[in-house]
């Protein structure tokens, strides 16, 4: 079983969910915890450079939670966003920056 670690952004979003949206997000995160890097489409997608996205519907939209894997069977969530064609490239770039910040911080310890 993989341990899911929430970034502040993802934790803030996740704790705001209720009802069916909370259930949908929890199901996908539980699946990620069980499958780890073996989780594939349509549930997860590899974006390159050790960056992945978890894919599901919540809040009546397609949601994405970006994440990476770390030592000790950890899944580190980075960002979350509403999937829209016009903002997808920008959001993936933002997730890559969050991943770089995480890796830099981890390297300092």
Name these PLM-found stretches:
Residues 1-62, 71-75, 81-109:
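Basic, Lys/Arg-enriched alpha-helical interface segments
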Residues 64-66:
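Short acidic loop-to-beta-strand element that houses the catalytic metal-binding Asp/Glu
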């Amino acid at each position: 079983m993989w341990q899911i670690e929430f970034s502040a952004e993802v934790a803030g979003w996740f704790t705001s969910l209720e009802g069916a949206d909370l259930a949908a997000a929890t199901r996908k995160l539980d699946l990620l915890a069980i499958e780890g890097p073996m989780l594939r489409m349509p549930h997860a997608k590899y974006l390159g450079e050790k960056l992945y996205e978890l894919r599901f519907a919540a809040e009546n939209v397609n949601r994405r939670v970006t994440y990476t894997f770390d030592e000790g069977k950890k899944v580190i969530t980075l960002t979350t966003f509403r999937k829209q064609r016009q903002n997808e490239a920008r959001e993936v770039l933002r997730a890559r920056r969050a991943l770089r910040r995480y890796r830099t911080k981890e390297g300092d310890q």
